[in-house]
Amino acid sequence: MTNETTKTQRAIMAVVAVIGGLYLMLLAPTQAMQTLKIALDQVLLRLVPHDADFYPAVPILSVTFSAWIIAFVFAGALLLVLSKKLYEGAKWARAAALGMFAIPSVAGMTMMIPWFVLVLSEYPEKGVPAHTVTGMPPSMPILFVSLLFYFIMLLADQDTLKNKMLKVVPYTLLGIVSGMVFMNGQHGARYFIHIPGEFVTDASGLISVNPTPPPFTSPLAHYITNLDHLDWRTFDMLSDKAVYSPQTLALLLGGFLLYIASVLLIVSIPLMAMKNKVGWYMATASALATAVVSFQGFVVRSSTEWLQGGLLSSVLLVVLLIPAFKNLLIEKGE
């Protein structure tokens, strides 16, 4: 980003930082928590009794939503502290503010998908009753408010129209890919930690806790070894003898590596805004890693979500390597 800004632009950025900071500290956490509670209520009462595969969504969403909520408060506090420096025209403050608004922008995206999958979607083939909640999630404003402030921070300078149009591409893709790989990470982590033997279908046909789960000494009780004995689609027993399953590695990388990459992509945004080469290398490596892992997940699990994630990561990788974009993100020759 160029550091050439007018007094009006600096005032706008300072006001945006104050409004955005207050929003992230005072309103966004409540909106996110309301979304989480409604989603978990639907999972526990509507979905899990008919399909135990949904249960891992409970700990996964509890942890990730909580992490985002905590990040909102810290980001909001930093934005308030940065507002004076933004008005003074400090480039580093603007880069930091851009990164702070990237956090809720990505988080807002990741909070939409669980709502559609767990709250609004119908699963009649599993015997799941119709949904009782309608409309958009309470967290939806987080996405759009944060995106608005994100682009104000990105574009409020005296750069040429051409350069502004060019830099919108990588800075938008960074957020989209970060959100996409995080959502795919939810899917991977959900199935990675799932232990099917902990659940059983009772006499009424509903899912309940298995009164005699696999003992802790059994490979069926561990998330690294259980799929070597089970059919990964139905979780039926295949063999007492371990048969190496590529599913475990695909889920590990397609879950936790994608989580880490999502965070690294967010961190790279303020670094590249300062034309720090570490940010570009971080983002490029993350795009490459997530492309490879996502395509691997698609091959192993035939998951179209991972195919989409792999394609988006590939697009980001190409964009970061194109000189017209790269020269806006780091100094020439680095």
Predicted regions, residues:
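Topology signature of small-to-medium multi-pass alpha-helical membrane proteins
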Residues: 1-334
